[in-house]
Amino acid sequence: MASEHSFDISAEVDMMEVKNALETAKKEIAARYDFKGLAAEVELNEKEKFITLLSSSDNKIDALKDIVISKLIKRNIPPVAITETKREPASGGNLKATLKLNDTLDSENSKKITKAIKDSKIKVSAQIRGEEIRVTSKSIDDLQECIKLVRGLNLELPISFKNLK
């Protein structure tokens, strides 16, 4: 039996699930009557981690965004993983909206999480390791209590827990 138990906290989005969600969203958009004959596109830029929506009006962009978010939720990707960065005019009188996938644990949120863990007086130690936080303890029960605490923080990130040893 191990004397030290640990897990990692990170903010990751499974890009394969995002691709699958966008494919099902494209199928739904193609089948919907309100998008017949209109420009309605959904594209993923994996490298930059952006989703681009293109349609004829603000209402249609909002409908596209709702479809994409509902498909992402069905694929267990939380809506906090997406923020709309900008809307701008595109060619042909269309509008273009850009959605950013938030999947990095920045230093500000890392510090918030470690401070909350230390303030909770749970017998664990938390260390920031780049884009991850390693939490160690002698008791698995303390680690599970720490997971509950972090889930209750309501951060605007898709928090995931991995490598529970």
UniProtKB/Swiss-Prot annotation:
<dbReference type="InterPro" id="IPR007551">
    <property type="entry name" value="DUF520"/>
</dbReference>
<dbReference type="GO" id="GO:0000166">
    <property type="term" value="F:nucleotide binding"/>
</dbReference>
<dbReference type="GO" id="GO:0005829">
    <property type="term" value="C:cytosol"/>
</dbReference>
<comment type="function">
    <text>Nucleotide-binding protein.</text>
</comment>
<dbReference type="InterPro" id="IPR035570">
    <property type="entry name" value="UPF0234_N"/>
</dbReference>
<keyword id="KW-0547">Nucleotide-binding</keyword>
<dbReference type="Pfam" id="PF04461">
    <property type="entry name" value="DUF520"/>
</dbReference>
<comment type="similarity">
    <text>Belongs to the YajQ family.</text>
</comment>
<dbReference type="InterPro" id="IPR035571">
    <property type="entry name" value="UPF0234-like_C"/>
</dbReference>
<dbReference type="InterPro" id="IPR036183">
    <property type="entry name" value="YajQ-like_sf"/>
</dbReference>
<protein>
    <recommendedName>
        <fullName>Nucleotide-binding protein Ccon26_01810</fullName>
    </recommendedName>
</protein>
